[in-house]
Amino acid sequence: MSARMRTSVAVLAAAGALALPATPAAAEGVGTTAVTWSVSLGTAKAEGTRRFEGTSLVAEGRLSNTGPGCYSVWTQVTHDFVPGPAVRNATLCGPGAVDVLVRRDYWLPTMTGRITVCEGSANTATCAPWKSLV
């Protein structure tokens, strides 16, 4: 086989490997064990665990508030260094607690997820620092 042919075969093989989608096994490689997370802002606190189920990133827990005002839990996934939109997952107004359940498709190795608590429910203008879920 000529050097040119070997180079062409190597390039095609590499391109094929890059085109393959991530598999559930890739996500499981990160760890299926539950990992705790916690975010607080003002009188609100969100806490729980995250884990991988196949190709899904799952975060579940509780958003609690001991004071007045509304607070929301938001998540955001970044894929290939491009942040997706922030998604509101739970809102609580006044004292009490509500469940939080987040399930997002997750493809390794170029994806990250993060979570925060924000004042109000309209946007992410006033929030606690984002916490990584991965």
Q: Where in the sequence are the language-model features?
A:
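N-terminal prepro-regions of secreted/extracellular proteins
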Residues: M1-K45
